[in-house]
Amino acid sequence: SCPAPATTFIGSIPSSSHSCGLSRFLINYYIPLFFVVSGYIYKEGRSYKENIEHKAKRLLIPYFGYSAVLLAVYVLMGRTLAETKASAFGILYSRYCLYDTTVVKDNVYLFTVANGAMWYLTAFFAASLVYHLVIDRCLSDRKFLIGTLIVLTAITMALADIPVLLPWSIDLACVGTIFMIAGTLLGRAQFFEKKWNIPLIAAVFVIYILTSCLDPGINMSIREYGIYGAFSVPFFIIVGLTGSLLCIWFGKLIENTAPGRFIAYVGKNTIFLLAFHIFALEVVERIASKFIAIPVPGGAVVPFVLYHALRITAAVLGCLAFSEILNRLKKRLRRKTR
Protein backbone atom coordinates (compact mmCIF):
# COMPACT_ATOMS: atom_id res chain seq x y z
CA SER A 1 0.00 0.00 0.00
CA CYS A 2 1.14 3.55 -0.66
CA PRO A 3 2.53 5.36 2.39
CA ALA A 4 1.40 8.77 1.14
CA PRO A 5 -1.41 9.45 3.64
CA ALA A 6 0.81 8.63 6.61
CA THR A 7 3.67 10.84 5.50
CA THR A 8 2.29 14.04 4.01
CA PHE A 9 1.28 15.49 7.35
CA ILE A 10 4.54 14.39 8.99
CA GLY A 11 6.15 16.64 6.43
CA SER A 12 3.91 19.57 7.33
CA ILE A 13 4.82 19.66 11.04
CA PRO A 14 8.28 21.28 10.79
CA SER A 15 7.04 24.55 9.31
CA SER A 16 5.15 25.18 12.53
CA SER A 17 8.06 23.92 14.64
CA HIS A 18 10.49 26.37 13.08
CA SER A 19 10.46 28.73 16.03
CA CYS A 20 11.32 25.89 18.38
CA GLY A 21 14.72 25.38 16.76
CA LEU A 22 13.84 21.98 15.26
CA SER A 23 13.84 23.02 11.63
CA ARG A 24 17.50 22.70 10.66
CA PHE A 25 17.19 19.03 9.80
CA LEU A 26 13.41 18.61 9.66
CA ILE A 27 12.22 21.31 7.29
CA ASN A 28 14.59 20.41 4.43
CA TYR A 29 12.38 17.55 3.22
CA TYR A 30 9.07 19.30 3.95
CA ILE A 31 8.01 20.43 0.45
CA PRO A 32 10.01 17.92 -1.67
CA LEU A 33 8.16 15.16 0.20
CA PHE A 34 4.82 16.24 -1.26
CA PHE A 35 6.21 16.11 -4.80
CA VAL A 36 7.84 12.71 -4.25
CA VAL A 37 4.65 11.22 -2.80
CA SER A 38 2.57 12.62 -5.66
CA GLY A 39 4.90 11.04 -8.20
CA TYR A 40 4.85 7.78 -6.26
CA ILE A 41 1.10 7.35 -6.69
CA TYR A 42 1.02 8.40 -10.37
CA LYS A 43 -1.29 6.29 -12.54
CA GLU A 44 -0.81 5.98 -16.28
CA GLY A 45 -3.62 5.97 -18.80
CA ARG A 46 -4.92 9.54 -18.66
CA SER A 47 -4.32 12.10 -21.38
CA TYR A 48 -2.35 15.28 -20.63
CA LYS A 49 -5.58 17.29 -20.65
CA GLU A 50 -7.27 14.87 -18.23
CA ASN A 51 -4.31 14.99 -15.84
CA ILE A 52 -4.18 18.79 -15.82
CA GLU A 53 -7.95 19.12 -15.38
CA HIS A 54 -7.74 16.71 -12.44
CA LYS A 55 -4.90 18.72 -10.87
CA ALA A 56 -6.73 22.01 -11.43
CA LYS A 57 -9.82 20.69 -9.68
CA ARG A 58 -7.77 19.21 -6.83
CA LEU A 59 -5.47 22.21 -6.30
CA LEU A 60 -6.77 25.45 -7.78
CA ILE A 61 -10.39 25.29 -6.61
CA PRO A 62 -9.28 24.89 -2.96
CA TYR A 63 -6.56 27.51 -3.44
CA PHE A 64 -8.86 30.26 -4.68
CA GLY A 65 -11.82 29.15 -2.55
CA TYR A 66 -9.94 29.03 0.76
CA SER A 67 -8.01 32.21 -0.13
CA ALA A 68 -11.32 34.02 -0.68
CA VAL A 69 -12.56 32.83 2.71
CA LEU A 70 -9.42 34.09 4.48
CA LEU A 71 -9.55 37.40 2.59
CA ALA A 72 -13.18 37.88 3.64
CA VAL A 73 -12.33 37.10 7.27
CA TYR A 74 -9.58 39.72 7.31
CA VAL A 75 -11.85 42.29 5.64
CA LEU A 76 -14.39 41.68 8.42
CA MET A 77 -11.55 42.13 10.93
CA GLY A 78 -10.96 45.66 9.62
CA ARG A 79 -8.56 45.53 6.68
CA THR A 80 -8.52 48.73 4.62
CA LEU A 81 -9.35 48.77 0.91
CA ALA A 82 -5.67 49.28 0.03
CA GLU A 83 -4.62 46.35 2.22
CA THR A 84 -7.36 44.20 0.72
CA LYS A 85 -6.22 45.03 -2.83
CA ALA A 86 -2.64 44.13 -1.90
CA SER A 87 -3.80 40.84 -0.39
CA ALA A 88 -5.87 40.07 -3.50
CA PHE A 89 -2.82 40.71 -5.70
CA GLY A 90 -0.82 38.37 -3.46
CA ILE A 91 -3.42 35.64 -3.95
CA LEU A 92 -3.25 36.04 -7.74
CA TYR A 93 0.58 36.18 -7.79
CA SER A 94 0.77 33.28 -5.31
CA ARG A 95 4.23 33.82 -3.85
CA TYR A 96 5.37 34.54 -0.30
CA CYS A 97 7.29 37.62 -1.39
CA LEU A 98 8.17 39.38 -4.64
CA TYR A 99 11.98 39.43 -4.57
CA ASP A 100 14.84 37.08 -3.81
CA THR A 101 15.44 37.55 -0.07
CA THR A 102 19.22 37.33 -0.53
CA VAL A 103 19.18 40.29 -2.94
CA VAL A 104 16.51 42.68 -1.63
CA LYS A 105 16.23 43.70 2.02
CA ASP A 106 13.02 45.76 1.78
CA ASN A 107 10.90 43.02 0.25
CA VAL A 108 7.26 43.08 -0.80
CA TYR A 109 5.39 40.41 1.15
CA LEU A 110 2.37 39.10 -0.70
CA PHE A 111 0.66 36.52 1.52
CA THR A 112 -0.92 38.78 4.14
CA VAL A 113 -4.10 36.93 5.12
CA ALA A 114 -2.52 33.93 6.89
CA ASN A 115 -2.34 32.13 3.55
CA GLY A 116 1.45 31.75 3.40
CA ALA A 117 1.41 27.95 3.17
CA MET A 118 -0.89 27.89 0.16
CA TRP A 119 1.88 28.83 -2.28
CA TYR A 120 2.49 25.08 -2.53
CA LEU A 121 -0.85 24.46 -4.28
CA THR A 122 -0.04 26.67 -7.26
CA ALA A 123 3.61 25.54 -7.21
CA PHE A 124 2.45 21.93 -7.43
CA PHE A 125 0.11 22.81 -10.29
CA ALA A 126 2.93 24.55 -12.20
CA ALA A 127 5.21 21.53 -11.68
CA SER A 128 2.42 19.21 -12.82
CA LEU A 129 2.25 21.06 -16.15
CA VAL A 130 5.86 20.01 -16.79
CA TYR A 131 5.70 16.58 -15.14
CA HIS A 132 2.73 15.29 -17.14
CA LEU A 133 4.38 16.53 -20.32
CA VAL A 134 7.41 14.25 -19.88
CA ILE A 135 6.64 11.43 -17.44
CA ASP A 136 5.27 8.78 -19.82
CA ARG A 137 8.23 9.19 -22.18
CA CYS A 138 10.61 9.13 -19.19
CA LEU A 139 9.18 5.77 -18.10
CA SER A 140 9.64 4.20 -21.54
CA ASP A 141 12.94 5.75 -22.67
CA ARG A 142 15.95 5.77 -20.31
CA LYS A 143 18.00 8.15 -22.48
CA PHE A 144 15.11 10.60 -22.55
CA LEU A 145 14.79 10.25 -18.76
CA ILE A 146 18.47 11.07 -18.17
CA GLY A 147 18.37 13.96 -20.63
CA THR A 148 15.20 15.33 -19.05
CA LEU A 149 16.70 15.24 -15.54
CA ILE A 150 19.83 17.06 -16.78
CA VAL A 151 17.79 19.74 -18.57
CA LEU A 152 15.44 20.23 -15.59
CA THR A 153 18.42 20.61 -13.24
CA ALA A 154 20.11 23.09 -15.60
CA ILE A 155 16.95 25.21 -15.90
CA THR A 156 16.52 25.19 -12.11
CA MET A 157 20.12 26.37 -11.66
CA ALA A 158 19.68 29.07 -14.32
CA LEU A 159 16.61 30.45 -12.51
CA ALA A 160 18.09 30.13 -9.01
CA ASP A 161 19.63 33.59 -8.81
CA ILE A 162 17.22 35.80 -10.74
CA PRO A 163 16.14 38.74 -8.53
CA VAL A 164 12.37 38.20 -8.78
CA LEU A 165 10.42 35.22 -7.43
CA LEU A 166 8.18 34.23 -10.34
CA PRO A 167 4.38 33.92 -9.98
CA TRP A 168 2.91 30.52 -9.14
CA SER A 169 6.48 29.34 -8.38
CA ILE A 170 7.20 28.81 -12.08
CA ASP A 171 10.90 28.97 -11.19
CA LEU A 172 10.42 25.87 -8.99
CA ALA A 173 8.46 23.85 -11.56
CA CYS A 174 11.49 22.01 -12.95
CA VAL A 175 12.93 20.93 -9.60
CA GLY A 176 9.43 19.97 -8.47
CA THR A 177 9.19 17.80 -11.58
CA ILE A 178 12.50 16.11 -10.67
CA PHE A 179 11.08 15.10 -7.29
CA MET A 180 7.86 13.87 -8.91
CA ILE A 181 9.78 11.79 -11.47
CA ALA A 182 11.88 10.32 -8.64
CA GLY A 183 8.68 9.40 -6.80
CA THR A 184 7.25 7.73 -9.90
CA LEU A 185 10.43 5.69 -10.40
CA LEU A 186 10.28 4.59 -6.75
CA GLY A 187 6.66 3.59 -7.21
CA ARG A 188 7.37 1.57 -10.35
CA ALA A 189 10.15 -0.26 -8.52
CA GLN A 190 7.81 -0.86 -5.53
CA PHE A 191 10.67 0.53 -3.48
CA PHE A 192 8.74 0.86 -0.23
CA GLU A 193 7.11 -2.54 -0.53
CA LYS A 194 10.43 -4.34 -0.23
CA LYS A 195 11.88 -5.78 2.97
CA TRP A 196 13.60 -3.38 5.35
CA ASN A 197 17.21 -2.76 4.33
CA ILE A 198 18.82 -1.35 7.48
CA PRO A 199 22.26 -0.61 5.91
CA LEU A 200 20.53 1.32 3.10
CA ILE A 201 18.39 3.30 5.57
CA ALA A 202 21.50 4.10 7.64
CA ALA A 203 23.37 5.23 4.52
CA VAL A 204 20.48 7.46 3.41
CA PHE A 205 20.30 8.95 6.92
CA VAL A 206 24.04 9.75 6.91
CA ILE A 207 23.81 11.31 3.44
CA TYR A 208 20.83 13.41 4.53
CA ILE A 209 22.57 14.71 7.65
CA LEU A 210 25.84 15.42 5.82
CA THR A 211 24.24 17.27 2.91
CA SER A 212 22.01 19.22 5.30
CA CYS A 213 25.13 20.33 7.18
CA LEU A 214 27.08 21.10 4.00
CA ASP A 215 24.25 23.11 2.47
CA PRO A 216 22.19 24.80 5.22
CA GLY A 217 19.63 27.55 4.71
CA ILE A 218 17.17 25.64 2.53
CA ASN A 219 13.72 27.17 2.07
CA MET A 220 12.03 26.07 -1.13
CA SER A 221 9.12 28.51 -0.77
CA ILE A 222 11.42 31.49 -1.37
CA ARG A 223 13.77 29.63 -3.75
CA GLU A 224 16.62 29.28 -1.29
CA TYR A 225 18.41 26.04 -2.16
CA GLY A 226 21.24 26.60 0.31
CA ILE A 227 24.31 28.80 0.73
CA TYR A 228 25.94 28.26 -2.68
CA GLY A 229 23.34 29.89 -4.91
CA ALA A 230 22.75 27.99 -8.14
CA PHE A 231 25.38 25.42 -7.17
CA SER A 232 23.24 24.45 -4.17
CA VAL A 233 20.60 22.94 -6.46
CA PRO A 234 22.21 19.46 -6.72
CA PHE A 235 22.69 19.41 -2.92
CA PHE A 236 19.07 20.46 -2.46
CA ILE A 237 17.86 17.64 -4.71
CA ILE A 238 19.87 15.11 -2.68
CA VAL A 239 18.60 16.55 0.61
CA GLY A 240 15.00 16.55 -0.62
CA LEU A 241 15.14 12.98 -1.91
CA THR A 242 16.95 11.45 1.08
CA GLY A 243 14.75 13.33 3.55
CA SER A 244 11.64 12.14 1.74
CA LEU A 245 12.87 8.54 1.79
CA LEU A 246 13.46 8.71 5.54
CA CYS A 247 10.05 10.26 6.16
CA ILE A 248 8.22 7.67 4.05
CA TRP A 249 10.11 4.84 5.77
CA PHE A 250 9.01 6.29 9.09
CA GLY A 251 5.44 6.45 7.81
CA LYS A 252 5.62 2.79 6.80
CA LEU A 253 7.01 1.90 10.23
CA ILE A 254 4.05 3.37 12.11
CA GLU A 255 1.23 2.94 9.56
CA ASN A 256 -0.43 0.07 11.46
CA THR A 257 -0.18 1.74 14.86
CA ALA A 258 -2.63 4.14 16.51
CA PRO A 259 -0.38 7.17 15.82
CA GLY A 260 -0.01 5.98 12.24
CA ARG A 261 -3.77 5.73 11.74
CA PHE A 262 -4.21 9.20 13.21
CA ILE A 263 -1.56 10.62 10.89
CA ALA A 264 -3.25 8.86 7.96
CA TYR A 265 -6.50 10.61 8.92
CA VAL A 266 -4.67 13.92 9.16
CA GLY A 267 -3.12 13.26 5.75
CA LYS A 268 -6.59 13.15 4.19
CA ASN A 269 -7.08 16.74 5.35
CA THR A 270 -3.70 18.03 4.16
CA ILE A 271 -5.02 20.74 1.83
CA PHE A 272 -7.44 22.10 4.43
CA LEU A 273 -4.60 22.17 6.99
CA LEU A 274 -2.27 23.90 4.53
CA ALA A 275 -4.93 26.53 3.96
CA PHE A 276 -5.96 27.28 7.53
CA HIS A 277 -3.27 26.18 10.00
CA ILE A 278 -1.52 29.58 10.03
CA PHE A 279 -4.81 31.35 10.74
CA ALA A 280 -5.57 28.76 13.43
CA LEU A 281 -2.14 29.34 15.01
CA GLU A 282 -2.86 33.09 15.10
CA VAL A 283 -6.25 32.50 16.73
CA VAL A 284 -4.72 30.21 19.38
CA GLU A 285 -2.01 32.81 20.07
CA ARG A 286 -4.56 35.60 20.51
CA ILE A 287 -6.65 33.51 22.89
CA ALA A 288 -3.59 32.36 24.86
CA SER A 289 -2.27 35.92 25.20
CA LYS A 290 -5.40 36.87 27.14
CA PHE A 291 -4.60 34.31 29.83
CA ILE A 292 -0.82 33.86 29.92
CA ALA A 293 2.41 35.65 29.12
CA ILE A 294 3.54 34.15 25.81
CA PRO A 295 7.04 32.58 26.16
CA VAL A 296 9.59 34.32 23.94
CA PRO A 297 12.74 33.01 22.21
CA GLY A 298 15.77 33.27 24.46
CA GLY A 299 13.78 32.67 27.62
CA ALA A 300 13.25 29.45 29.53
CA VAL A 301 13.40 26.54 27.08
CA VAL A 302 10.79 24.21 28.62
CA PRO A 303 7.88 26.73 28.75
CA PHE A 304 8.75 27.93 25.24
CA VAL A 305 8.77 24.45 23.69
CA LEU A 306 5.72 23.33 25.68
CA TYR A 307 3.72 26.38 24.66
CA HIS A 308 4.48 25.94 20.96
CA ALA A 309 3.76 22.21 21.11
CA LEU A 310 0.37 22.91 22.70
CA ARG A 311 -0.30 25.77 20.28
CA ILE A 312 0.40 23.58 17.25
CA THR A 313 -1.68 20.73 18.67
CA ALA A 314 -4.64 23.02 19.38
CA ALA A 315 -4.43 24.58 15.90
CA VAL A 316 -4.26 21.21 14.14
CA LEU A 317 -7.11 19.69 16.17
CA GLY A 318 -9.21 22.80 15.58
CA CYS A 319 -8.64 22.57 11.82
CA LEU A 320 -9.44 18.86 11.81
CA ALA A 321 -12.67 19.42 13.74
CA PHE A 322 -13.75 22.19 11.36
CA SER A 323 -12.81 20.07 8.34
CA GLU A 324 -14.85 17.15 9.71
CA ILE A 325 -17.89 19.40 10.16
CA LEU A 326 -17.56 20.67 6.57
CA ASN A 327 -17.19 17.13 5.22
CA ARG A 328 -20.34 16.01 7.02
CA LEU A 329 -22.26 19.02 5.72
CA LYS A 330 -21.09 18.21 2.17
CA LYS A 331 -22.32 14.61 2.54
CA ARG A 332 -25.73 15.80 3.72
CA LEU A 333 -26.02 18.22 0.80
CA ARG A 334 -25.11 15.46 -1.65
CA ARG A 335 -27.80 13.19 -0.20
CA LYS A 336 -30.42 15.93 -0.54
CA THR A 337 -29.49 16.64 -4.16
CA ARG A 338 -29.81 12.97 -5.19
Residues of each region from the PLM?
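Alpha-helical transmembrane segments and their immediate juxtamembrane cytosolic regions
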Residues: 1-338
